[in-house]
């Protein structure tokens, strides 16, 4: 049985994390530089749409996710980052739907 699209997406997330984590130091964690590269290379549309490409945003996201304050992002902390980005993108999607609906129905 082939993987479903969601299963394939989950595998890709795991692979992406390990691909970038292997660039320097600990192969099971991301440094700030590895996280920046991962986000800007792998989810550029999310970052652009959310207005999140600024280095300070990624640095703050790193600090918020680094729960144990070891200056590394483990996989669980990475999932927190992905969750935040997906929630922000989902909210943006709903804002666009509302704006489209309001425009179509002359509510502005």
UniProtKB/Swiss-Prot annotation:
PROSITE patterns recorded: EF_HAND_1, EF_HAND_2
Taxon lineage: Eukaryota, Metazoa, Chordata, Craniata, Vertebrata
Gene source species: Mus musculus
GO MF terms held by the record: calcium ion binding; chemoattractant activity; identical protein binding; transition metal ion binding
A GO CC term assigned to this protein in UniProt: extracellular space
Residues that, per the record, bind Ca(2+): 66, 68, 70, 72, 77
InterPro entries: EF-hand-dom_pair, EF_Hand_1_Ca_BS, EF_hand_dom, S-100_dom, S100_Ca-bd_sub
Location of the EF-hand domain: 53-88
Record GO biological process: inflammatory response
Domain of life (superkingdom): Eukaryota
Keywords attached to this entry: Calcium, Metal-binding, Zinc
Name the UniProt record assigns to this protein: Protein S100-A15A
């Amino acid at each position: 049985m082939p993987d479903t699209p969601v299963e394939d997406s989950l595998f890709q997330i795991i692979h992406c994390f390990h691909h970038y984590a292997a660039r320097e130091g600990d192969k099971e964690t991301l440094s700030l530089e590895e996280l920046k590269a991962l986000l800007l290379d792998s989810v550029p549309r999310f970052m652009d749409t959310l207005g999140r490409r600024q280095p300070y945003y990624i640095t703050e996201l790193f600090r918020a996710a680094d729960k144990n304050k070891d200056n590394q992002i483990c996989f669980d902390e990475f999932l927190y980052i992905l969750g935040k980005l997906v929630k922000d993108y989902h909210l943006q999607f709903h804002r666009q739907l509302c704006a489209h609906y309001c425009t179509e129905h002359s509510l502005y």
